[in-house]
Amino acid sequence: MSDNPVKEEVQQFDKKCLKKTNTAEKNTLPTKEDIDQEKKAAEGGK
């Protein structure tokens, strides 16, 4: 298994050549008001 060229390359990879990136939160959680509105809409539809 040690003769696998991909595994050898991964072990020799230098993390210093990676660039730092800033991540942006895309999936925000709903507010309490949003949840309440959805509950009221669901109850009204029954």
From Swiss-Prot:
PROSITE patterns membership: THYMOSIN_B4 (PS00500)
* GO CC, one annotated term: cytoskeleton
Cross-referenced Gene3D superfamilies, in alphabetical order?
Single helix bin
Give compartment(s): Cytoplasm, Cytoskeleton
- Composition bias (Basic and acidic residues) maps to 31-46
Q: Would the keyword Cytoplasm turn up in this protein's UniProt record?
A: yes
Molecular function (Gene Ontology), one example: actin monomer binding
UniProt-listed GO biological process terms: actin filament organization; regulation of cell migration
By its UniProt entry, which InterPro entries does this protein fall under?
A: Beta-thymosin (IPR001152), Beta-thymosin_sf (IPR038386)
Location of the region described as Disordered in the Swiss-Prot/TrEMBL record: 21-46
Segments of skewed composition (Polar residues): 21-30
UniProt keyword annotations, A-Z: Actin-binding, Cytoplasm, Cytoskeleton
Family note: Belongs to the thymosin beta family.
What task does this protein carry out?
Answer: Plays an important role in the organization of the cytoskeleton. Binds to and sequesters actin monomers (G actin) and therefore inhibits actin polymerization.
Record-given protein name: Thymosin beta-a
Q: Which organism is it from?
A: Cyprinus carpio (Common carp)
